[in-house]
């Protein structure tokens, strides 16, 4: 687990930077179950042996410098991956997706599964290439990302027709919220 307390890309309501702290505070109530958690429905124990969850703290964010903050994020994710661990990143706004995905370039043919109301495929919203409205477009530009599946898309006004056309031309699978409601999740 690593926190990325960054929300400078947020255009409306800030506060996502407090996400890592909030999750840690809430999870501290359940920190006593070192042997894992038993699920009576599945009749299985989760997050017990051999799993080990490590809190790596927060990425160093310089709240006036997006580039350096994103470099710090990318470096932290690369370090976690180099230890053969799976990073679970707590944000932060959608803009943090880009440096996180960039760090995964040690793998080939990755598929990104994106749950969101918005397409996040804008070219450079408000002149910002690595903002919260464009991480899926940035992902499509990365050689190690071979597929993007977007689930729950419904946000009218968050993307233009050309953004949807570009996403479809890239090969994204777009499943709208209406399709999810109609077809269910199984």
Name the predicted role of every residue range:
Residues 1-186:
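Conserved alpha-helical scaffold segments that buttress catalytic/binding sites
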């Amino acid at each position: 687990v690593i926190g990325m307390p960054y929300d400078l890309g947020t255009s409306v309501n800030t506060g996502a930077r407090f996400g890592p702290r909030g999750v840690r505070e809430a999870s501290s109530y359940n920190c006593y179950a070192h042997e894992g958690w038993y699920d009576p429905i599945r009749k299985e124990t989760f997050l017990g042996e051999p799993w080990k969850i490590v809190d790596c703290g927060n990425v160093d964010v310089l709240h006036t410098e997006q580039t350096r903050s994103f470099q710090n994020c990318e470096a932290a994710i690369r370090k976690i991956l180099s230890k053969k661990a799976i990073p679970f990143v707590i944000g932060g706004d959608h803009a943090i997706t880009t440096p996180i995905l960039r760090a995964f370039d040690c793998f080939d043919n990755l598929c990104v599964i994106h749950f969101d109301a918005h397409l996040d495929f804008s070219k450079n919203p408000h002149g910002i290439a690595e903002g919260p409205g464009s991480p899926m477009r940035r992902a499509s530009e990365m050689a190690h990302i071979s597929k993007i599946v977007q689930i729950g898309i419904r946000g009218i006004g968050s993307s233009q027709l050309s953004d949807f056309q570009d996403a479809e031309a890239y090969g994204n699978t777009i499943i709208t919220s209406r399709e999810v409601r109609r077809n269910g999740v199984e």
